[in-house]
Amino acid sequence: YPPDELLSAAHALAQRIVTNRSPVAIALTRQMLYRNAAAEHPRVAHEVDSIAMFYAGMGDGKEGVASFREKRDPVFTGKASAMPDFYPWW
């Protein structure tokens, strides 16, 4: 992008990332990226990912699947400030 368009393009990308996405899922993904990059072994990423997949079957995860199947916008109730019980164990 030309320098004068870069900031608006970054804002547009950020908006696409957060629109109709679970705040908890975004926060967990961000933390997984930050923490797993420094992990000593790839198995750590697998363990965290497995727990995150389990969590996806509850709360906002269920709402995300239901809204997709019902072809409607999701209504997420989870807050990034109220992370799941397993966070941050890694």
Where are these regions (language model features)?
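Alpha-helix N-cap/N′ positions at the starts of helices
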Residues: 47-48
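Short alpha-helical scaffolding segments that buttress acidic/His motifs in well-ordered protein cores
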Residues: 29-33, 51-53, 68
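C-terminal long alpha-helix characteristic of the crotonase
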Residues: 1-44, 59, 75-90
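Short, flexible active-site recognition loops that position polar ligands and cofactors
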Residues: 53-59
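Interdomain hinge/lid region at the active-site interface
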Residues: 60-61, 67
